[in-house]
């Protein structure tokens, strides 16, 4: 993170002409288990990772917000918080920031303008929530600069609202919540209905290894929407608000009445919720053998029932599983049809995993992977006052 801090300080001073007063960060995240459960009111188990979005900031006495994006060649966006805050067609990055500020104002928070320089190293397009980290770090920045009485959960909800209503992207609450509330060496069990969270301790030395298949993700939106509709149809047949409310026993009694495809989709969600709650218990007990079994079951369910994995992802999972055996776990993470796998790997095996993947993945698929070796880290907060 030190390089990011240096970059935002330097760009702040160069472009805005004076020194910032605060450095704030918010992390990306990876979901360890609980896939496609969020929009079914279920459970997820993400952790924050040591890839962050960092801000250098200072408050202004007037109503102007000026933002410098280091990652877009020090491009600048500027808006007045007393005027209508509008969507910028030609500066997509700026809309996340505008949306967060607009939503904070709509929620009744009072503040003046600010100068902000922002940079991040959360890999974009890998499904590690670079957009949520940006939304949360901006909310955190206004909290810190103006001593706003806003909880971390509300910073997360505000970020989600900005993405849904201002940016126009329909996301669940997981990404923002873990970025805002993460804890070092802990995962977070999140109930996507009540928004209750529970910290789950992880074995301290355990590496969180994320491997991007670099398989271009096609069909994601249309397939995602289809899955969502199938889940809603299943909930309707069971007469419940969401699949969260169906037990596996109830499912088995009624499975004959369901369309075969809808039954497979529902079975994934219902069993995945049970797995996620049990995974939190296994992780807390540092029972990596059980955690690994649950992650393997999750992957098989995504592959066979939810049908969102692809050959490249299945290949990666098999390669990693060979190396870690029952000392850790591995599965696809994220929306599917490409993207990343996540593995919990004992530190002694990290180099083996990297070497084996390098030796086998490209040979099998023609694609070169990207590997990120992470630790579970703290959520958003003040890094330093200058």
From Swiss-Prot:
Catalytic residues, chain numbering: 175 (proton acceptor)
Record keywords, A-Z: ATP-binding, Carbohydrate metabolism, Cytoplasm, Galactose metabolism, Kinase, Magnesium, Metal-binding, Nucleotide-binding, Transferase
Superkingdom to which the source organism belongs: Bacteria
Molecular functions (GO terms): ATP binding; galactokinase activity; magnesium ion binding
Residues given in the record as substrate binding sites: 35-38, 224
Reactions listed under catalytic activity: alpha-D-galactose + ATP = alpha-D-galactose 1-phosphate + ADP + H(+)
Transmembrane segments: none
Pathway: Carbohydrate metabolism; galactose metabolism
Annotated site location: Transition state stabilizer: 29
Record InterPro entries: Galactokinase, Galactokinase_bac, Galactokinase_CS, GalKase_N, GHMP_kinase_C_dom, GHMP_kinase_C_sf, GHMP_kinase_N_dom, GHMP_knse_ATP-bd_CS
EC assignment: 2.7.1.6
Reported function: Catalyzes the transfer of the gamma-phosphate of ATP to D-galactose to form alpha-D-galactose-1-phosphate (Gal-1-P).
Family under the similarity heading: Belongs to the GHMP kinase family. GalK subfamily.
Name listed for the protein in its UniProt record: Galactokinase
Recorded name of the encoding gene: galK
């Amino acid at each position: 993170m030190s390089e990011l801090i240096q970059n935002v300080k330097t760009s702040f001073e160069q472009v805005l002409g004076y020194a910032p007063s605060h450095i704030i960060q918010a992390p990306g995240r990876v979901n360890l288990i609980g896939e496609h459960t969020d929009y079914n009111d279920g459970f997820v188990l993400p952790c924050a990772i040591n890839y962050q979005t960092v801000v250098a900031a200072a408050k202004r006495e007037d109503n102007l917000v000026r933002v410098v994006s280091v990652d877009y060649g020090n491009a600048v966006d500027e808006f007045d918080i007393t005027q209508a805050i509008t969507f910028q067609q030609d500066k997509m990055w700026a809309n996340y920031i505008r949306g967060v500020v607009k939503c904070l104002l709509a929620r009744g928070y009072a503040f003046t303008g600010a100068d902000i320089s922002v940079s991040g190293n959360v890999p974009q397009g890998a499904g590690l929530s670079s957009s949520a980290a940006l939304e949360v770090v901006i909310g955190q920045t206004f909290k810190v600069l103006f001593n706003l009485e806003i909880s971390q959960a509300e910073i997360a909800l505000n970020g989600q609202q900005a993405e849904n209503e201002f940016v126009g992207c329909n996301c669940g609450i997981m990404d923002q919540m873990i970025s805002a509330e993460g804890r070092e060496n802990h995962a977070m069990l999140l109930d996507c209905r009540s928004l209750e969270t529970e910290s789950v301790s992880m074995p301290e030395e355990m590496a969180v290894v994320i491997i991007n298949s670099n398989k271009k993700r096609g069909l994601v939106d249309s397939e995602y929407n289809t899955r969502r509709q199938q889940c809603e149809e299943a909930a309707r047949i069971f007469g419940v608000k969401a699949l969260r409310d169906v037990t596996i026993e109830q499912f088995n009694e009624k499975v004959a009445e369901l369309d075969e495809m809808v039954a497979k989709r529902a079975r994934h969600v219902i069993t995945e919720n049970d797995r996620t709650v049990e995974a939190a218990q296994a992780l807390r007990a540092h029972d990596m053998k059980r955690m690994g079994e649950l992650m393997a079951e999750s992957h098989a369910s995504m592959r066979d029932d939810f049908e969102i994995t692809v050959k490249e992802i299945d290949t990666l999972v098999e390669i990693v599983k060979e190396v870690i055996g029952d000392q850790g776990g591995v599965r696809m993470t994220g929306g599917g049809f490409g993207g990343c796998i996540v593995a919990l790997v004992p530190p002694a095996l990290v180099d083996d995993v990297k070497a084996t993947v390098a030796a086998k993945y490209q040979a099998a698929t023609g694609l070169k992977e990207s590997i990120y070796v992470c630790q579970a880290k703290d959520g958003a907060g003040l890094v330093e006052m200058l």
